[in-house]
From Swiss-Prot:
MF annotations from Gene Ontology: ion channel inhibitor activity; toxin activity
Protein name from the UniProt record: Conotoxin PnMKLT1-0121
Keyword Secreted among record annotations: yes
Intrachain S-S bonds: 52-67, 59-71, 66-75
Amino acid sequence: MKLTCMMIVAVLFLTAWTFATADDPRNRLENFFSKTQHEMKNPEASKLNKRCIAESEPCNIITQNCCDGKCLFFCIQIPE
């Protein structure tokens, strides 16, 4: 009986935590799961998959996608 009550309280707590930490207040769980499914279908959309460009490689001036330093058509390391 005590274990059942503890399980019910744990499930209610986790559900409330999920709603409280959701990004969009209107579509809390729906929005969370749709973003996750989109990232699974398109791994390039994942924030963890962002690639950076090594030094002396061509880069994008607008996005500044160099690992270290700055992008001036090629990634260059700027001494501090």
